[in-house]
């Protein structure tokens, strides 16, 4: 069993650009490859967990999500970084694509994606973390009984300044970006 780091995609790994409806809009944030490589080298399973409701809403096809994930993995390879698994939820209860328009257990903040990973990847949940740029990621962590780290990239700064004061669930740590979050996790491991 290995610890896992469950990482949100949009706003945490790549620039937050709303719904990415073309592969050319996918841009990695600075330091992401270094952060993931650091986690890889320190024996952490790296898992991407992402809501992609644009599929259900008809903004883009599920194939585009898969192509973006392939591009992301190619870009990370340049930094000797790899992702162990990618899980995403294409559903939304108010979607327009019937196949994906429904309630589900995999849409964050529900913990379905983490529970699936726990079963499939032999994860040590006692030493695992969630990283994301939105409070929904912190709720996601809470629902899986994991510490959540909020990064200040993407929507993070706005979440800290405007949303967090009104929420009862708070992050275990607030990090500048994914690299600082990874470094903080490794300090906790000691």
Give the ranges of each region predicted by the language model.
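Conserved Lys-Pro-Asp/Glu-containing loop-to-beta segment of HAD-superfamily phosphomonoesterases
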Residues: 105-138
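Non-catalytic pre-domain segments flanking phosphatase-related domains
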Residues: 1-7, 175, 183-190
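Short, electropositive alpha-helical surface patch
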Residues: 59-73, 99-113, 139-145
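Substrate-recognition element of Asp-dependent hydrolases with the DxDx(T/V) motif
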Residues: 32, 36-72, 81-95, 141
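Metal-dependent phosphoesterase signature
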Residues: 14-30, 55-64, 78-81, 96-105
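Active-site neighborhood of HAD-like aspartate-dependent phosphohydrolases
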Residues: 1-47
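Acidic, Mg2+-coordinating phosphoryl-transfer loop and its flanking beta/alpha structural elements
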Residues: 129-173
């Amino acid at each position: 069993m290995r610890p896992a780091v469950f990482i949100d995609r949009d706003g945490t790994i790549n620039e937050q650009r709303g719904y990415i409806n073309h592969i050319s809009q996918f841009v990695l944030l600075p330091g992401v490859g270094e952060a993931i490589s650091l986690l890889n080298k320190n024996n952490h399973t790296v898992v991407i967990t992402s809501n992609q409701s644009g599929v259900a809403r008809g903004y883009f096809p599920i194939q585009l999500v898969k192509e973006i994930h392939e591009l992301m993995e190619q870009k990370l390879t340049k930094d000797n970084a790899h992702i162990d698994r990618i899980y995403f939820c294409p559903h939304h209860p108010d979607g327009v694509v019937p196949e994906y328009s429904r309630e589900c257990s995999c849409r964050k903040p529900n913990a379905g994606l983490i529970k699936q990973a726990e079963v499939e990847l032999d994860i040590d949940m006692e030493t695992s973390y969630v990283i994301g740029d939105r409070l929904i990621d912190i709720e996601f962590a809470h629902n899986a009984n994991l510490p959540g780290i909020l990064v200040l990239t993407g929507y993070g700064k706005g979440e800290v300044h405007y949303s967090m004061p009104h929420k009862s669930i708070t992050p275990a740590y607030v990090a500048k970006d994914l690299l600082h979050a990874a470094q903080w996790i490794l300090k906790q491991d000691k």
